[in-house]
């Protein structure tokens, strides 16, 4: 969804939206098949790594709400540390990022039951809310991850 926002040509945007829907549906089918086999699925809700100075990279993508609806529980996991540094020569190209040694802490929060989590958020919005409900749910996930990240960051 973040990449779609940058497409201004209506024809190209329509084409890219159709392509994006196909990818998302294939992903959803795959996630559902994994879930039915009892496999654990890890999803990065922002769709990318955070890039300092690019606050949009810290925002969760709304499609994560669809994954949440397919899943019984989720476990917020934060990864603190920076072993993949942005290239000074080409900061916009992640392929040029540098691998560096660093201390990394992987933290896990409490297991959260998806259905009640979503229902509570939507109930608090009220019936008259006309904004993007999916984005509100994902923003709450990102808020949980941010708090968790800050806690573990303080231990480093």
Predicted feature residues:
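Conserved nucleotide-cofactor-binding alpha/beta core module
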Residues: 1-11
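Non-catalytic C-terminal accessory region of glycerolipid acyltransferases
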Residues: 10-156
């Amino acid at each position: 969804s973040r990449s779609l926002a940058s497409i201004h040509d209506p024809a190209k945007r329509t084409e890219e939206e159709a392509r994006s829907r196909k990818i998302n549906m294939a992903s959803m089918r795959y996630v559902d098949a994994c879930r039915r086999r009892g496999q654990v699925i890890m999803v990065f809700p922002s769709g990318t790594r955070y890039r300092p100075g690019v606050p949009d990279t810290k925002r969760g993508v709304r499609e994560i709400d669809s994954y949440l609806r397919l899943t019984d529980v989720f476990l917020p996991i934060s990864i603190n540390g920076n072993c993949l540094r942005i290239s000074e020569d080409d900061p916009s190209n992640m392929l040029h990022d540098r691998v560096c040694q660093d201390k990394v802490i992987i933290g896990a929060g409490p297991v959260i039951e998806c259905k009640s989590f979503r229902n509570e958020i939507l109930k608090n919005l009220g019936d008259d809310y006309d904004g993007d409900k999916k984005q509100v749910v994902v923003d709450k996930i990102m808020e949980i991850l941010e708090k968790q990240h800050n806690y573990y960051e303080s231990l480093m």
